[in-house]
Amino acid sequence: MNTIWIAVGALTFLGLVFGAILGYASRRFAVEDDPVVEKIDAILPQSQCGQCGYPGCRPYAEAVGLQGEKINRCAPGGEAVMLKIADLLNVEPQPCDAEEQQAAPVRMLAVIDENHCIGCTKCIQACPVDAIVGATRAMHTVMSDLCTGCNLCVDPCPTHCIELRPVNETPDSWKWDLNTIPVRIIPVEQHA
């Protein structure tokens, strides 16, 4: 019985020693991040779609903050994100890339043909925003509220049952930005 307590005590002691060493090392050798990069990364939509030419939002934020990359390359964020980054960096706003300069940009949505889906989960693994739900060997579907239309789920599908379709804007599907809609308070006379 004593050997069990000795083993438990030794493992506890080793855990505490190695934990203290790791705690010291994490503080001693910590790399400070650039606060500007952190702020730019917080502004970006975190869709990790790669449409900007970088593998995710963090590398794009580092390129903008440290290497002077153009601030107008985030397609999912569009003009709103570009204006926030321009304000943060105190630079002139730039026109969005050619794809973004359409008169009325069309929101795209991934659609799965559920009759041909084999439930391989490759699309789920490829989706950067977890907009696809389903289980192995079961039907998958796309949650339209979360899908950014980044096109990353289309190529991994072995049965080619995923396609991007334009979303028809209706009052139910429209993203109402209540901060930009002017609100006027109309005085109302109260009668007794």
Swiss-Prot record:
All copies of domain 4Fe-4S ferredoxin-type, residue ranges: 108-137, 138-167
Stretches assigned to the 4Fe-4S domain: 32-91
Biological processes annotated in GO: electron transport chain
Molecular function GO terms recorded: 4 iron, 4 sulfur cluster binding; electron transfer activity; metal ion binding
NCBIfam families attached to this UniProt entry: PRK05113.1, rnfB
PANTHER family referenced in this protein's UniProt entry, alphabetically: ION-TRANSLOCATING OXIDOREDUCTASE COMPLEX SUBUNIT B
Family: Belongs to the 4Fe4S bacterial-type ferredoxin family. RnfB subfamily.
Protein name (Swiss-Prot/TrEMBL): Ion-translocating oxidoreductase complex subunit B
